[in-house]
Amino acid sequence: SEGGIAGVGVAEWVSGATETVSEETVSTLVGGEDPSQRERMGDMMYRATSPFGRKGAAVEAISAVDVAFWDIAGKEADKRVYELLGGPVTDEIPCYASNLHPVDHEKLEREALEYVEAGFDTMKMRFLHGPEAGRKGMRENEALVETVRDAVGDDIAIAADAYMGWSVRYAKKMLDRLERYDLAWVEEPVIPDDIDGYADI
């Protein structure tokens, strides 16, 4: 900012592409501009990066700059950013353990129990298999969920992430098999663009 305040913004999943978009496109747009003009700058960045697509590196770069603008605003006002956004709306923010990556059933069970001991009442695991693994993969996915459910009991919420690896047909079959385990949610069974697929599921 003109007052010498630096804002910090972070892009997750940083890749060479994100760095390139940040340095060669986004930074050239916002350099010397008024960081309090967040909406105008956001619109400018969004338009300038449209040839790069509306997902991935371009949006990550824009997001990092937007966060930095908010960081500057908070520092200038001597307030936390959440106060600038209207203040707290709750006394607590729910969180969950999100690192249950199946390697084998014993390790998965041990990790799940460690999360319970650490005080988590919700945890998310990953599936190992998609349609290419056929019925055997379905059985193994179910067995992994069963391992976690048996380990933590019914009072702990379990979610699971397919990371866009399923087809609609496979997802519907898999979700039918998993219904008895009372999962809190199944994340990204198909790609985000498949709106009709999500409606079908």
Explain the meaning of each model-derived region.
Residues 2-76:
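Metal- or metallocofactor-binding catalytic centers and their adjacent structured scaffolds
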